[in-house]
From Swiss-Prot:
<dbReference type="InterPro" id="IPR011009">
    <property type="entry name" value="Kinase-like_dom_sf"/>
</dbReference>
<feature type="disulfide bond">
    <location>
        <begin position="147"/>
        <end position="175"/>
    </location>
</feature>
<dbReference type="InterPro" id="IPR000494">
    <property type="entry name" value="Rcpt_L-dom"/>
</dbReference>
<feature type="glycosylation site" description="N-linked (GlcNAc...) asparagine">
    <location>
        <position position="432"/>
    </location>
</feature>
<keyword id="KW-0464">Manganese</keyword>
<feature type="glycosylation site" description="N-linked (GlcNAc...) asparagine">
    <location>
        <position position="908"/>
    </location>
</feature>
<feature type="glycosylation site" description="N-linked (GlcNAc...) asparagine">
    <location>
        <position position="634"/>
    </location>
</feature>
<keyword id="KW-0812">Transmembrane</keyword>
<feature type="region of interest" description="Disordered">
    <location>
        <begin position="670"/>
        <end position="691"/>
    </location>
</feature>
<dbReference type="InterPro" id="IPR003961">
    <property type="entry name" value="FN3_dom"/>
</dbReference>
<dbReference type="GO" id="GO:0001556">
    <property type="term" value="P:oocyte maturation"/>
</dbReference>
<dbReference type="GO" id="GO:0005524">
    <property type="term" value="F:ATP binding"/>
</dbReference>
<feature type="disulfide bond">
    <location>
        <begin position="279"/>
        <end position="299"/>
    </location>
</feature>
<keyword id="KW-0547">Nucleotide-binding</keyword>
<dbReference type="InterPro" id="IPR017441">
    <property type="entry name" value="Protein_kinase_ATP_BS"/>
</dbReference>
<keyword id="KW-0479">Metal-binding</keyword>
<keyword id="KW-1133">Transmembrane helix</keyword>
Length: 1358
């Protein structure tokens, strides 16, 4: 009760506190930063709403008990984000914030509203009342002990989950993750589907995740599942009450949630309404002298862009005439990122100096223009330095004046230095700039030609102010296309990874102006590079540069030896002369060469990468690897070498007869691509886990996620640097594995291993096994190593070799260890167990060892029996090596049997055959025993004869009773039948002239079925399309009557989801039965028509999960109607369900499909046809048919729907299916089958019939997914629906064809039916008891007292 009052109190307190104002300190803010000590958490005491973010971080050396007494139940809302980082000792948030309900995410931490990062002790999140994160995503990362992450359905908390990033936490396989009730197998928590996994949703083993009823839609709900008021967010304490909300969807005002703020109040911080007086005091809370202002109904910190503060009314904003003159005072504003530029957004006058230092950035020009594009005047100077990301200054599109009130040393007002990519200042035909005071200075702007600078002199009015050295002609434009002479290479050669070049000596007009040369080179896989490639606006420069001094002799050509190049790599190279000569146009007059391409020599490749190995069988290992990162040539082949490893001799130090467990038993099951027919298989003769061997390439989404992760980590580290202390130092990279330094210079092709050594050799720890090797072509990157020993560890080395391997050798090796799979029968003891009597009551058992076991033999287990008692003994490996067996001592006299099994490193071998031995008696006792041995068998013989006599008498008596009461005798007049069997016309009779037959639909049980038109058979319909069933002309009178009697039973059906009988034409020939027309045929044919790869495809899409559930509900509704009326169907399958024009599925007419799908039936023991693939285990075994067995068949129908009518148990014969089902086998989950549908199937396939749900329970579990129209027509929602009884009628029979076909016969004595035979296959059975209401129950051999059977349709196949 106390817990239920918390939200009520919270909502009431929240309204009270907001009325009282900030003094009550219940609305905490603007931000809460908790760090360094647990005691700092006391700042949160009494907080109901945190207006801003909550950060709890960097609390080290804390223990779990430090948090036990800390509890903040009042906190319900955080308006920004929640961040937890490196807080030790905190195990769960459930006690800390039990009522935190909403995180609004108004301000996000790098797109995330909830960040849990590197919380080393956190075991569960535990925010069990968190219902809504309004904006932002979730990032939960690197929490090594965190479980209960996959049990939370974040789609119930967030509107979109695709931006969530949850990685690096405790592996799910190591987490228990049991929701409340799971241990007791009780359904307490709601279920939902995430990534095709339909499971319970919870925050911990004590708290379920709250799921509101579907009727609430997007509205919140209370803890009692009552729908809240539409203005409530998260939760509420009373339904449809806007004063009982825990949080508000829009705004909070005076204890009530409102869609918008009332008049004379103003929106504040996106969640509450305050008065003008409160807004005026807000600056006190922010610790600032600048008051808040009111604009467009909101209390805001400053006027937005396009508005300025109204001087007459200090708390309001007024629009500007043109651009707002927004003056920003900054002594020195340095722009080094988009974030820093954002601080000047909207500024038109910068009162101070502007410095640009933009080294990197993507789409940087657009971002800078957005934030700096309104600046018109800079009162000081402008300095642009090291801004490699800038190509132009056009983003300062409004800059008109640089006043130069403050200047740099040297009296510079415009200073441009070392901007590698700057090529343009402004478009001077459209831009005008005036520099009132000071000079300009340009240096080391390699792509900015002098003409651009001289143009700026003229426009800005600074021409003549600066000296010539202020505009360096040698460093500005030196990498632009200002040269005029082409240098030619005179020689070029290569030696391994070095390139030697010489070129002609350039002779400028004045030789003194030639300073030096610069050689540019870069890797160039393709011959399509240009001089400016790689020098983009992101600041990168992919060209390597080397300065070359002039040679001492004027006659010598300059040259260079480029060293340290990558082997077998093509390089692009060009050389440029550095001069001081100027022409009349004041451009630099220099020289450069054309780009040439050269490839270095090959070298030894690096090692292969990413080696993995998996066992393919007991004698094979599959090895896969990736190419070397540096092939250093054309990769040619790989050398694969392998070596058997000796067994671990330390394993023999233990006596495993006294150990709780044997060593870990694992073989290689790595991830291997299954191409090439080398897919790993299960252990021979055993059932193993299904491995996954597909290494999928990364998708674009995965690559983007990795990029985002790296970017997030960078931002997060920057946050730590700016907010906490210093970033973590770079970690040293750890070698994944060590490899040898030697290279392989030769190889011997050998893909198999030598003859195996005997087992005794394998037990030696000093043996060194030889290496074997084979050569694999470079295209394959995988191989299969064969002829290996079972369950044995191997080392596998791989060397990569390129086209120069004969000269240079191959790479060092990369290696991996892998164990082969166990071999079936390898641990079996060969031969027999030998026995030897050594003394009175002492028997020695000896046996040979397995020849090549799966690893080491650890022990032997002996089982011997005496007089029904089983005894076990254990022999350790050490004892066996000493004695060769075991002595059984103090054995009482008598006959014994014994068997032995070996236990290896892998597991248990098979038991040997039983060996019998006798422990003899002492001589003085043998005579007495001999008398007993003779007497006892004689007595038993007499007893056995008496029992047999009694059994024979009883059996004979019982048969005589049956002969008189149940056997049908051949009639003298076979044409005679009882008058009770005659069909009597009734109100269902339809005049023949009202029936018109149009076209054939197919062959039915008794004859052809037609489509036709009937007049007046349906109320308020003049004509109705119908299905017309007929009887063959050659049918006998009995067959015609049975045909009509079957129709008579259908008269009792009145359910929307059961095919209806509309009328009967019994007068004249042929006899007709008028049925409801199912235009789309049977469900099986309909489902197959939806297969996209079939010729008969109807063009309709494959059914969605909702459509499948709709079909299931309609079939279950029809079956629940039959169940309520004591009918057992016995042949529920897709072929016996029909589909209407509007795609409604109904239980069929119980006989029309038998001939069409004869292959779906199986004749057991030469008797009637049985649908074994749809039958339950109890029906197959004992011939028992109940509603529970119909539920089993319903599960198979669901499987048919999911597979579009594939045959169940495909690949098995009918006999195999019969054994498989009776032994507990189930159908596998179909491909792409939704978890919800498969879960429904599994419930129907419970082996215990009583554990299966009823049809009403099935509908109840899926009713929320069904169409609204289902309520109007279904039996489930009708007044007739009553809960089914569960008591069964005890009926027994073997053959389905023995059920009486004539309903009138059932009204006579039941003994007549006991012997009645029919050729019909399975159908529907009606069981009705006049004296009570019991669960429908039927048996193949017919019924008993007070029952009535539905006549089964005849089948020519029977």
């Amino acid at each position: 009760m106390k817990a239920e009052l918390v939200p009520v109190c919270t909502a009431w307190i929240l309204g009270l506190l907001l009325c009282l104002g900030p003094a009550a300190a219940k609305v905490c803010g603007p931000n809460m930063d908790i760090r360094n000590d647990v005691s700092e958490l006391k700042q949160l005491r009494d907080c109901v709403v945190i207006e801003g973010y909550l950060q709890i971080l960097l609390i080290s050396n804390a223990k779990a008990e430090d948090f036990r007494n800390l509890r903040f139940p009042n906190l319900t809302v955080i308006t920004d984000y929640l961040l937890l980082f490196r807080v030790s000792g905190l195990v769960s948030l459930s006690n800390l914030f039990p009522n935190l309900t909403v995180i609004r995410g108004r301000v996000l931490f790098y797109n995330y509203a909830l960040v849990i990062f590197e919380m080393t002790d956190l075991k569960e999140i535990g925010l069990y009342n968190l219902r809504n994160i309004t904006r932002g995503a979730v990032r939960i990362e690197k929490n090594s002990e965190l479980c209960y992450v996959s049990t939370v359905d974040w789609s119930l908390v967030l509107d979109a989950v695709y931006n969530n990033y949850i990685v690096g936490n405790k592996p799910p396989k190591e987490c228990v993750d049991l929701c409340p009730g799971a241990r007791e197998k009780m359904q307490i928590c709601e279920k939902s589907s995430i990534n095709n996994e339909f499971a319970d949703r919870c925050w911990s083993d004590e708290h379920c995740q709250k799921v509101c009823p579907s009727v609430c839609g997007k509205r919140a709900c209370s803890d009692n599942n009552e729908c809240c008021h539409p203005e409530c967010l998260g939760s509420c304490t009373a339904p449809d009450n806007d004063t009982a909300c825990v949080a508000c969807h829009h705004y909070f005002y005076e204890g009530r949630c409102v869609p918008t703020c009332p008049s004379n109040t103003y929106k504040f911080e996106g969640w509450r309404c305050i008065t003008r007086e409160v807004c005026a005091k807000m600056h006190i809370w922010i610790h600032s002298t600048i008051p808040f202002i009111i604009h467009k109904g909101e209390c805001v910190y400053e006027c937005p862009s396009g508005y300025m503060l109204n001087k007459s009314q200090s708390m309001t904003c007024s629009p500007c005439e043109g651009p707002c003159p927004k003056i920003c005072e900054e002594k020195m504003k340095t722009i080094d990122s988009v974030t820093s530029a954002q601080m000047l957004e909207g500024c038109t006058v910068l009162k101070g100096n502007l410095q640009l230092n933009i080294r990197k950035g993507q789409n940087i020009a657009a971002e800078l223009e957005n934030f700096l594009g309104l600046i018109e005047t800079v009162t000081g100077y402008v300095k642009i330095r090291h801004s490699h990301a800038l190509v132009s200054l056009s983003f300062l599109k409004s800059l008109r004046y640089i006043l130069g009130e403050e200047q740099m040393p040297g009296n510079y007002s415009f200073y441009v230095f070392d901007n590698n990519n700057l090529q343009q200042l402004w478009d001077w035909s459209k831009h005008n700039l005036t520099i009132k005071e000071g000079k300009i200075r340009f240096a080391f702007n390699s792509k900015l030609c002098a003409s651009e600078i001289y143009r700026m002199e003229e426009v800005t009015g600074t021409k003549g102010r600066q000296a010539e050295e202020d505009i360096s002609l040698s460093t500005n434009g030196n990498m632009a296309s200002c040269e005029s002479h082409v240098l030619n290479f005179t020689s070029r050669s290569k030696i391994k990874n070095r390139i030697k070049l010489t070129w002609e000596r350039y002779r400028p007009p004045d030789y003194r102006d030639l300073i030096s040369f610069t050689v540019y080179y870069k890797e160039a896989p393709f011959r399509n590079v240009t001089e400016y490639d790689g020098q983009d606006a992101c600041g990168s420069n992919s060209w390597n540069m080397v300065d070359v001094d002039l040679p001492a002799s004027k006659e010598s050509d300059p040259g260079i030896l480029l060293q340290g190049l990558k082997p077998w790599t093509q390089y692009a190279i060009y050389v440029k002369a550095i001069t001081l000569t100027m022409l009349e146009n004041r451009h630099i007059h220099g020289a450069k060469s054309k780009i040439i391409y050269m490839r270095t020599d090959a070298a030894v490749p690096s090692i292969p990468q990413d080696m993995i190995s998996a066992s393919n069988s007991s004698s094979q290992l599959v090895v896969k690897w990736n190419p070397p990162s540096l092939p250093n040539g054309n990769l040619s082949y790989y050398i694969v070498r392998w070596q058997q490893q000796p067994q671990d001799r330390h394993l023999y130090q233990y006596n495993y007869c006294f150990k709780d467990k044997v060593p870990n038993r694992k073989y290689a099951n790595g991830t291997i691509d299954t191409e090439g027919g080398t897919e790993p298989t299960k252990p021979e003769g055993s059932v193993g886990e299904k491995g996954h061997y597909c290494a999928c390439p990364k998708t674009e989404a995965e690559e983007k996620a990795e990029k985002d992760e790296a970017e997030y980590r960078k931002v997060f580290e920057n946050f730590l640097h700016n907010s906490i202390f210093v970033p973590r130092p770079n970690r040293r990279r750890r070698d994944v594995l060590a490899v040898g330094n030697s290279t392989v210079t030769s190889y011997e092709k050998n893909s198999t291993t030598e003859d195996f050594s005997n087992f005794s050799d394998s037990e030696r720890d000093d043996i060194e096994y030889p290496f074997y090797e084979t050569k694999v072509d470079y295209k394959w990157e995988r191989t299969v190593i064969s002829n290996l020993q079972p369950f044995t560890l191997y080392r596998i080395d791989i060397h990569s070799c390129n086209h120069e391997a004969e000269k240079l050798g191959c790479s060092a090796s990369n290696f991996v260890f892998a164990r082969t799979m166990p071999a079936a029968g390898a641990d079996d003891i060969p031969g027999i167990v030998n026995t030897k009597e050594e003394d009175d009551g002492v028997i020695f058992l000896g046996w040979p060892e397995p020849l090549r076991p799966n690893g080491l033999i650890l022990m032997y287990e002996i089982e011997y029996k005496h007089q029904g008692e089983v005894h076990r003994e254990c022999v350790s490996r050490q004892d066996y090596r000493k004695n060769g067996g075991i002595k059984l001592v103090r054995l009482p006299p008598g006959n014994y049997s014994a068997q032995v099994q070996a236990i290896s490193l892998y597991g248990n071998g098979s038991w040997t055959e039983m060996v019998s031995f006798c422990v003899k008696l002492k001589p003085d006792v043998r005579n007495n025993i001999l008398q007993m041995v003779v007497a006892i068998p004689l007595a038993l013989s007499f007893l056995l004869v008496g029992i047999i006599s009694i059994v024979c008498f009883v059996f004979k008596k019982r048969n005589s009773n049956r002969l008189g009461n149940g056997v049908l005798y051949a009639s003298v007049n076979p044409e005679y039948f009882s008058a009770a069997e005659m069909y009597v016309p009734d109100k269902w009779e339809v005049p023949r002239e009202k029936i018109t037959m149009n076209r054939e639909l197919g062959q039915g049980s008794f004859g052809m079925v037609y489509e036709g038109i009937a007049k007046g058979v349906v109320k308020d319909e003049a004509e109705t399309k119908v299905a017309i069933k007929t009887v063959n002309e050659a049918a006998s009178m009995r067959e015609r009557i049975e045909f009509l009697n079957e129709a008579s039973v259908m008269k009792e059906f009145n359910c929307h989801h059961v095919v209806r009988l509309l009328g009967v034409v019994s007068q004249g020939q042929p006899t007709l039965v008028i049925m409801e027309l199912m235009t789309r045929g049977d469900l099986k044919s309909y489902l197959r028509s939806l297969r996209p790869d079939t010729e008969s495809n109807s063009g309709q899409p494959t059914p969605s999960l909702k459509k499948m559930i709709q079909m299931a509900g309609e079939i279950a509704d029809g079956m629940s109607y039959l169940n309520a009326n004591k009918f057992v169907h016995r042949d529920l399958a897709a072929r016996n369900c029909m589909v209407t024009e509007d795609f409604t599925v109904k239980i069929g007419d119980f006989g029309m499909t038998r001939d069409i799908y004869e292959t779906d039936y199986y004749r057991k023991g030469g008797k009637g046809l049985l649908p074994v693939r749809w039958m339950s285990p109890e029906s197959l075994k004992d011939g028992v048919f109940t509603t529970n067995s119909d539920v089993w068949s319903f599960g198979v129908v669901l499987w048919e729907i999911a597979t579009l009518a594939e045959q169940p148990y495909q690949g098995m014969s009918n006999e195999q299916v019969l054994r498989f089902v009776m032994e507990g086998g189930l159908l596998e989950k179909p491909d792409n089958c939704p978890d919800m549908l498969f879960e429904l199937m599994r419930m129907c396939w419970q082996f215990n019939p009583k554990m299966r749900p009823s049809f009403l329970e099935i509908i109840s579990s899926i009713k929320d997914e069904l169409d609204p129209g289902f309520k109007e027509v279904s039996f489930f929602y009708s007044e007739e629906n009553k809960p089914p009884d569960t008591e069964e009628l005890d009926l027994e029979a073997e053959n389905m064809e023995s059920i009486p076909l004539d309903p009138s016969c059932a009204l006579q004595n039941s003994e007549h039916h006991a012997g009645h035979k029919s050729e019909n296959g399975p159908g529907v059975v009606v069981l009705r008891a006049s004296f009570d209401e019991r669960q429908p129950y039927a048996h193949m051999n017919g019924g008993r007292k007070n029952e009535r059977a539905l006549p089964l349709p005849q089948s020519s196949a029977c």
